[in-house]
């Protein structure tokens, strides 16, 4: 059983209890933790849409600690991140592997971070199917289609050529945050919260 801490907030109307994750959503912080699957993805998509409706001009902060998971679930989160108006700042804490690394890279350019001792991994999608030869061929072609789509997403967000992405994705590629920064998965390795604030000021100054 997972233990989720409860926090008590004092308001003018008295005390109110929140689970810790719901309280952090009030601060526009979303957690992507554990395997990426349909139920978790639905909650994250709902949180993104809610925070956009609350304030479409204020950043959302996504903290990622995930080994990856179901591609379609991950892509539903990815598409929503691109769809909504607020910038989504991503931060890797622990690990961002497979679909987790794609979500990390999909944050707003200039606002993608990793803590210094995190681990990041990219690879091509995998899957298995049993049945008639024709059915196996259909599913194999679908995996190849998904592989091409994921490669194109990494190409878009890292600035690398498609050929380079295909080479890196051929096998499991583990990297530390500094290597992830060099290949464009993140923008900066940070150790303290103040580093994010400094970076955001710099980005705003460049835009202005």
From Swiss-Prot:
Main location: cytoplasm
Annotated compartments: Cytoplasm
GO biological process: protein quality control for misfolded or incompletely synthesized proteins
CDD domains in alphabetical order: S14_ClpP_2 (cd07017)
GO function terms (MF aspect): ATP-dependent peptidase activity; ATPase binding; serine-type endopeptidase activity
EC number, UniProt record: 3.4.21.92
GO CC annotations on file: cytoplasm; endopeptidase Clp complex
UniProt cross-references to PROSITE patterns, sorted A to Z: CLP_PROTEASE_HIS, CLP_PROTEASE_SER
UniProt keyword list: Cytoplasm, Hydrolase, Protease, Serine protease
InterPro entries: ClpP, ClpP/crotonase-like_dom_sf, ClpP/TepA, ClpP_His_AS, ClpP_Ser_AS
Transmembrane segments: none
Domain of life where this protein originates: Bacteria
Top-level EC class: hydrolase
Catalytic activity annotation: Hydrolysis of proteins to small peptides in the presence of ATP and magnesium. alpha-casein is the usual test substrate. In the absence of ATP, only oligopeptides shorter than five residues are hydrolyzed (such as succinyl-Leu-Tyr-|-NHMec, and Leu-Tyr-Leu-|-Tyr-Trp, in which cleavage of the -Tyr-|-Leu- and -Tyr-|-Trp bonds also occurs)
Gene3D superfamilies the UniProt entry points to: 2-enoyl-CoA Hydratase, Chain A, domain 1
Family: Belongs to the peptidase S14 family.
Complexes and interactors: Fourteen ClpP subunits assemble into 2 heptameric rings which stack back to back to give a disk-like structure with a central cavity, resembling the structure of eukaryotic proteasomes.
NCBIfam families per UniProt: clpP, PRK00277.1, PRK12553.1
Function: Cleaves peptides in various proteins in a process that requires ATP hydrolysis. Has a chymotrypsin-like activity. Plays a major role in the degradation of misfolded proteins.
Protein's recorded name: ATP-dependent Clp protease proteolytic subunit
Organism: Wolbachia sp. subsp. Brugia malayi (strain TRS)
